[in-house]
C-alpha cells in the first residue's frame, strides 16, 4: 500500500468496523440495511456529492433466502407419497418447486418474486463531477450494503473442512431429486405399469425416512434468525467502504481526478436476495445518461490478502465481463505488488456486475476472497478482526491504478478525435483586386 493513501485505507477500515460491529447483520430489506444506507448517505452529503436514494420492493426469500423452502417441500412430498391419492399432487408440487429453484435461485430471475413476502430496500448513490460540470464518461464504483443469512452448515469453528457443508446439502439435494423422480414414477406407473408400481410402492415405506432426513438437511442451509446473520465485514462492508473512499480521495485531490470524468459511488441494496438492487437500478435507468459511456467497477469482498482476484464472469448467469477492464485489473494488481493475482469465473451464484453487463455497461468485479468454501463466507464469523487494514489498503491501491488506466484510455480517445476547423479564405493579391474592380465611369 502506498503511504499517500494510508489515511484513506484507515478510514475505509473504520467504515467496515462500524458496519459490522455497530450496525451488525444487514439482511435484504431489513432495518439495519436501511441504517447503513443512511450512514453512507450522510457521508456522501458530507463530501458535497449530489446524492440520490431510490426505493424498490424486494422479496428477500424469493431467491437464495428461500433455499430452505426446497427442503420443506421435499419433506412434504416424501410424506405424501405414502398415500396413493396424493401421488399426482406431490409430483406437481415438487416439479413446481424445481422450476422456481432453477429460475430464482440459480438464474436469479425475478419471475416468481410476486409469490413471496416483500420488504423495501434502497439504492443510494452520490455523484462527483468536475468543477465545470462537463464530463465525457462515468466511472461507477458499486458495492452492496446487505449481508447474508448465516449458512449453518459451514458456520463451524472446528478443524473440520467447511466444504463438508456442500456434502451435506448435496446429500439433501439428491434426496429431493429422488423424491421427485419417485413421485412421477408412482403417479404414472399406477396406470401403465402395475408391476413397477407395486414394487416401488411396497419398498417406499423403507426409503421414506431417509428421504425425509436428507431433505431436512436442506432446510438447515440458512438460519432465518436475523441476530445470527452475517455481520458482513468482508461481504460487503469492504466494497461499500472502498467505493466511498475512492470518491473521497478524488474529492480531496482534484488534481488527480480524471479529466472530464464523473465518479459515482453506488450502494446497491439486496444483492444477497438475488442481485435485486442492481437489477432495479439498471431497469430504472435504462437508456439514461447515467449508464452511457460508463465503466462499472463492482467491489465485493476485499479481505483475504492471499486471494486478490478479478472476477471475469458468472458461470450460472452465463455472463463474461469486459476484457479490457479485466486486463487493467490484472496489470494493476501486479503494479501494486500482488505476487499472484487471480483471474476467476464465479462458480456459483452471481455478482452485481451481471445486471450491468446485461444492460450493456462495461463492468468487472474486483475481490480479495478465498474462492473455496470457508467458515466465514456468509456466516456469523465474517468479522473485521479476521483481516487487516493493509489488505483493504492494497485493494484501494489497485482500484486507483485501474482508474488511472481508464482515464488514459479516455484521454487517448479525445486526442484521436479530429477537431474540425473552418477552411481559411485565401487572401486576395493586389493584382486580383485590380482585375475584379469595376471600371470607373469617364
Where are these predicted regions, by residue range?
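N-terminal hydrophobic or amphipathic helices/low-complexity stretches enriched
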Residues: 1-32, 37-51, 62-66, 128, ...
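Long, low-complexity, intrinsically disordered segments
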Residues: 423-442
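Active-site-adjacent substrate-binding region
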Residues: 25, 32, 55, 304-419
Amino acid at each position: 500500500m502506498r503511504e499517500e493513501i494510508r489515511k484513506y485505507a484507515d478510514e475505509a477500515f473504520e467504515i467496515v468496523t462500524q458496519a459490522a460491529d455497530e450496525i451488525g447483520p444487514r439482511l435484504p430489506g431489513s432495518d439495519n440495511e436501511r441504517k447503513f444506507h443512511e450512514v453512507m448517505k450522510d457521508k456522501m452529503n458530507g463530501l458535497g456529492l449530489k446524492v440520490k436514494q431510490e426505493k424498490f420492493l424486494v422479496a428477500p426469500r424469493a431467491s437464495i433466502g428461500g433455499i430452505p423452502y426446497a427442503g420443506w417441500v421435499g419433506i412434504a412430498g416424501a410424506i405424501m407419497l405414502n398415500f396413493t391419492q396424493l401421488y399426482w399432487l406431490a409430483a406437481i408440487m415438487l416439479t413446481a418447486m424445481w422450476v422456481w429453484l432453477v429460475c430464482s435461485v440459480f438464474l436469479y430471475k425475478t419471475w416468481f418474486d410476486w409469490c413471496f413476502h416483500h420488504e423495501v430496500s434502497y439504492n443510494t448513490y452520490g455523484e462527483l463531477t468536475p468543477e465545470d460540470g462537463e464530463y465525457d464518461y462515468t466511472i461507477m464504483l458499486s458495492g452492496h450494503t446487505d449481508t447474508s443469512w448465516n449458512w449453518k452448515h459451514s458456520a463451524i469453528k472446528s478443524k473440520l473442512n467447511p466444504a463438508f457443508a456442500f456434502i451435506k446439502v448435496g446429500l439433501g439435494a439428491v434426496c429431493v431429486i429422488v423424491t421427485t423422480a419417485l413421485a412421477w414414477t408412482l403417479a404414472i406407473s399406477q396406470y401403465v405399469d402395475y408391476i413397477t408400481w407395486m414394487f416401488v410402492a411396497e419398498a417406499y415405506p423403507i426409503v421414506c425416512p431417509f428421504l425425509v432426513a436428507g431433505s431436512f438437511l436442506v432446510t438447515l442451509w440458512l438460519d432465518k434468525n436475523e441476530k445470527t446473520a452475517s455481520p458482513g465485514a468482508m461481504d460487503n462492508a469492504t466494497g461499500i467502504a472502498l467505493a466511498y473512499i475512492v470518491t473521497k480521495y478524488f474529492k480531496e485531490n482534484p488534481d488527480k481526478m480524471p479529466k472530464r470524468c464523473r465518479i459515482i459511488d453506488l450502494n446497491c441494496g439486496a444483492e444477497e436476495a438475488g442481485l435485486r438492487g442492481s437489477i432495479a437500478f439498471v431497469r430504472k435507468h435504462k437508456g439514461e445518461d447515467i449508464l452511457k459511456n460508463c465503466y462499472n467497477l463492482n467491489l465485493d469482498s476485499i479481505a483475504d490478502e492471499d486471494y486478490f482476484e478479478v472476477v471475469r464472469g458468472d458461470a450460472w448467469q452465463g455472463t463474461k465481463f469486459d476484457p479490457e477492464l479485466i486486463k487493467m485489473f490484472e496489470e494493476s494488481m501486479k503494479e501494486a505488488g500482488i505476487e499472484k493475482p487471480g483471474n476467476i469465473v464465479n462458480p456459483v451464484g452471481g455478482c452485481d456486475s451481471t445486471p450491468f453487463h446485461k444492460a450493456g455497461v462495461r463492468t468487472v468485479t474486483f475481490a480479495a476472497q478465498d474462492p473455496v468454501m470457508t467458515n466465514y463466507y456468509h456466516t456469523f464469523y465474517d468479522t473485521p478482526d479476521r483481516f487487516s487494514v493493509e489488505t483493504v489498503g492494497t485493494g484501494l491501491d489497485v482500484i486507483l491504478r485501474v482508474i488511472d488506466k481508464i482515464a488514459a484510455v479516455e484521454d487517448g480517445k479525445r486526442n484521436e478525435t479530429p477537431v474540425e476547423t473552418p477552411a481559411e479564405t485565401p487572401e486576395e493579391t493586389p493584382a486580383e483586386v485590380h482585375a475584379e474592380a469595376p471600371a470607373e465611369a469617364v
